Amino acid sequence: MRTYSPKPGDVTRQWHIIDAQDIVLGRLATTAANLLRGKHKAIYAPHMDMGDFVIIINADKVHLSGNKKTQKMAYRHSGFPGGLRSVRYDELLAKNPEKAVEKAIKGMIPKNTLGRQMLSKLKVYAGDQHPHAAQQPVPFEITQVAQ
């Protein structure tokens, strides 16, 4: 029996919607990254984009455990010498909560062209409204043991 190799036509993409209210940021990011990569599917292949579309709403109500809100820093670099910039996560969540969630998920996706293609299927919104009702997204429930 030969090993099954999925073809691009075999991939069926589904739309998932995740409510991030009171969900720990790391748990939200790992779940979203697995959905984007397609690791939840039986026909997963690491060399292909098998993932689904993921909509995350209420990104401004995401939870950070411990003192991470005031102590954890988000870094970015301009590419120029001395261009390292940092901001605390409480400031980042207040100013741009979508960016904080995207940054956490981006760190869990491969850093190559396939990863960039996977990230294009991620849609993050600060409020509970989104413009993707026509795609009929299926609610995805994240069950947490503790917060």
Curated annotation (Swiss-Prot):
One of its GO terms (cellular component) is cytosolic large ribosomal subunit. The keyword Ribosomal protein applies. InterPro entries: Ribosomal_uL13, Ribosomal_uL13_bac-type, Ribosomal_uL13_CS, Ribosomal_uL13_sf. Pfam families: Ribosomal_L13 (PF00572). The keyword Ribosomal protein applies. One of its GO terms (biological process) is negative regulation of translation. Disulfide bonds: none annotated. GO terms for molecular function: mRNA binding; structural constituent of ribosome. SUPFAM superfamilies: Ribosomal protein L13. Gene3D superfamilies: Ribosomal protein L13. Keywords: Ribonucleoprotein, Ribosomal protein. Part of the 50S ribosomal subunit. This protein is one of the early assembly proteins of the 50S ribosomal subunit, although it is not seen to bind rRNA by itself. It is important during the early stages of 50S assembly. Belongs to the universal ribosomal protein uL13 family. PANTHER family: LARGE RIBOSOMAL SUBUNIT PROTEIN UL13M (PTHR11545:SF2), RIBOSOMAL PROTEIN L13 (PTHR11545). This is Large ribosomal subunit protein uL13.
